[in-house]
């Protein structure tokens, strides 16, 4: 699922319910100024959590959701100098929490095969129950 818009040479996109990503995904996200990217679950929390087996399999499957780790790896593939805002969203209430998503994504970027580090980009986590701050690009 994705929503994109462009105005005055500012490109932003929302990418949720991905399950996995591939070169097509990277190609469509790589030149953005801002991205809202799902960071749905921590794999360990999901595995030991309350979801029934079939639901765990769906979440982990190709049509499920990106884990924190995959979200970080995808960001490694799309980072560039003009990316001004990264917003992590669509966090599972049962299988994730804000600080874990944030730190895991930052770790993946810092360990990734990219010249960039997490400190080079503003990364925020969308709140589940309140409006996020306005992001000016």
Put a short name on every predicted segment.
Residues 12-18:
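Active-site-proximal beta-strand elements of phosphoester/diester hydrolases
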Residues 17, 91, 128:
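Cofactor-binding loop segments of dinucleotide-utilizing enzymes, especially the Rossmann-like FAD-
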Residues 1-11:
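Single conserved hydrophobic/aromatic residue that forms the stacking wall/gate
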Residues 10, 96, 133-134:
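Short active-site-adjacent helix-start/loop capping segments
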Residues 23-124:
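Cap/insert and terminal regions of metallo-dependent hydrolase folds
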Residues 121-137:
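Short, basic/aromatic-enriched C-terminal tail that caps enzymatic domains
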